[in-house]
Amino acid sequence: MRTRCNVIEGLCILVIGLICALASPAGAQAPTAGPVQAWGLPPLPAGVGPVEKFADVSGTPQGQFLEGGSFDTQGNLWFVAIGSGWISHLTPEGKLVPVVNCNPPPEFGQTCEPQGSRWFEGKLYLTSRHRGILIYDPQTKELKTLVYTWRNQLFKGPNDLDFDAEGNLFFTDPWGTGPGPNMSDQTGAVYQYARDGMLRKVMDSGAFPNGIAVSPDDTLLAVGDFRAGRLWYGTFQNGPNMGCPQCPKDPSHSTFAGVKAGTFMPGNGGPDGIHYDVKGNLWVASPPLGGVLEINPRGVVLGFVPIPNDDGATTNFAFGGPDNQYIYFEGAISGTFWRFKAPYPGLIGPGGVRLPAQP
């Protein structure tokens, strides 16, 4: 009886196997995942062109740890060197043009250490770890300080900056890179220097707020927290504050209806410089990962573009080039610049002009 049962069971298994084989298309294989890069990073984003070298400033004072990145109206890529204090630009052909050094005279004993850069209304705005927010006027060649203290205390080390559509300036101030008030307060902050000249602290938490960008629809402030390895999104309070009916409306973008935690970086990659494209995708530079990530408006990582020379410090980048659709990103340690064509144009165009958002 047991032998007969075994025969019947075997026939059943054989029949089921034949049915499954007939139901499958000829040559069909089990689905496989797409190629995965080092550290489990996603593949290249769709629509990305090949990466090519744009310039090499290694071995020069202007190439000592690259940061910043912004295009003027003539197509020049401006950048800074943290290690030497130089503010320079590359011509559209990739030729290096040193412009000005922001280090004070040696007798003052303090370096500048510039970080972020952004053009706005014909002037270059910069963050400096030790000198606060600087403005360079290309017409007069003057470099001056806009603001360097909050309530009579030095900033902790201003890092990056962006403007909203109304012309309000936002900048991050992480603890640990600049003079800093004291060791007991190791949190960072985000400030707004409003169009009317008022300085406000709009965020006072976060381990190390770094990159910062205002969304294409001017409703969100994205902040990259380098130490926490994630992004934060603050929704601007434009209309009535439902939690405070007696409070006035806030068209100046100085308060938030809410702040929420966003995407964690894959591979423990802390976010550095961040920029939106016109579709609302957020592009994020990550020094630990050595490249840039594309994240869609829902917070999903769409892909990763590595820097070709394995430079472990992709600090920042800028949209520019033909149709403002090329990303120029930096190898901070190697002193090299690379570029590739992105799927969509960047939100910030030449001279810091915000381009129209696309649905």
Show which residues each predicted segment covers:
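Beta-propeller domains
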Residues: 78-102
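Beta-propeller fold detector
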Residues: 52-55, 97-103, 144-148, 201-204, ...
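Short loop/turn segments immediately following the C-termini of beta-strands
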Residues: 82, 129, 174-176, 226, ...
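Beta-rich, blade/repeat-based domains predominating
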Residues: 58-76, 104-130, 151-169, 175, ...
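A short loop-to-beta-strand structural motif that recurs across blades of beta-propeller domains
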Residues: 86-88, 132-134, 188-191, 230-232, ...
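Short loop/turn segments immediately following beta-strands, especially the blade-tip
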Residues: 234-248, 341-348
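Blade/loop signatures of beta-propeller domains
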Residues: 29-52
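Bacterial N-terminal signal peptides
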Residues: 10-21
